[in-house]
Amino acid sequence: MSKPTVGINGFGRIGRLVLRAAVEKDSVNVVAVNDPFISIDYMVYLFQYDSTHGRFKGTVKHEGDYLIVANEGKSQHKIKVYNSKDPAEIQWGAAGADYVVESTGVFTTIEKANAHLKGGAKKVIISAPSADAPMFVVGVNHEKYDHANDHIISNASCTTNCLAPLAKVINDNFGIIEGLMTTVHAVTATQKTVDGPSGKLWRDGRGAGQNIIPASTGAAKAVGKVIPELNGKLTGMAFRVPTPDVSVVDLTARLEKPASLDDIKRVIKAAAEGPLKGVLAYTEDQVVSTDFVSDTHSSIFDAGASIILNPNFVKLISWYDNEFGYSNRVVDLISYIATKA
């Protein structure tokens, strides 16, 4: 079977890392990129040099209006570059892109993302939560994808991708009565380097490098969309902290069935080595956040940091590279839905 052909709209943090993940996984073929704000020579530079994940280990250059990306032992990607502001104008079909990753953060509804289908794309994967597109978390509910009807889908958020596999394992084994999630989250591009105006959410406009900033997140409630049994049982919030990448979820939950910490560790380790291998990982090491930069998992359970008050009340800790782990799942989701075509 030929590899799925992919277009990327928006060559920002996620767009570029989806391309890196695609090159490393070698499971999809990226054939087009669109970004109205980045010239092709600037794309080469931004892809090659990354302050967080380091220099790209392969080669990247441009020939005419094509990016040529290659890495030793991996397939070469010859990528047509577009600079359209209107997604309906991007010639995905002409470039041969069947699957479009919508990573601008702008076209996150079915109506807006539908513009990509007009340009010849067959499916759109939104790399953000969506108000109305069905959300899929690889390892949790990706098998509910319906090829006949799901043309525009969401890969949910990086935090939902971390929390959902953990919540699934705990709920399947012990049952979750209710839970609260906190994510201690690295800075992202929407934040300000110094204090500035920020619409209705005044705190979000404060300097990212000098503050711990309480923020809202829909990630916990979104778990109820991907695991219907948990609908209405989880909510959460975020603290934005001055680190460039890697975040950590703290899930505090009441369990239906009593469990020891060893019981919990055992079922998570079994899932990480079995059905959720590659998505969920398990560590007993004395780790800190930078140990997970460029980690490809959605969620890495920290056995040593997790605690219990009593057999029905637990606090579980799980790390995630909110950029690269998530980008790898975007590629995995495309690989999966392509098998249903």
From Swiss-Prot:
Pathway the protein takes part in: Carbohydrate degradation; glycolysis; pyruvate from D-glyceraldehyde 3-phosphate: step 1/5
GO terms, biological process: glucose metabolic process; glycolytic process
UniProt GO cellular component terms: cytosol
Main location (coarse class): cytoplasm
Enzyme Commission code(s) on record: 1.2.1.12
Active site feature: C158
Subcellular location: Cytoplasm
Residues where D-glyceraldehyde 3-phosphate binds: S157, C158, T159, T188, T217, G218, R240
CDD domains: GAPDH_I_C, GAPDH_I_N
Keyword set, alphabetical order: Cytoplasm, Glycolysis, NAD, Oxidoreductase
Subunit structure: Homotetramer.
PANTHER family: GLYCERALDEHYDE 3-PHOSPHATE DEHYDROGENASE (PTHR10836), GLYCERALDEHYDE-3-PHOSPHATE DEHYDROGENASE-RELATED (PTHR10836:SF76)
Name of the featured protein: Glyceraldehyde-3-phosphate dehydrogenase 2
Provenance organism: Caenorhabditis briggsae
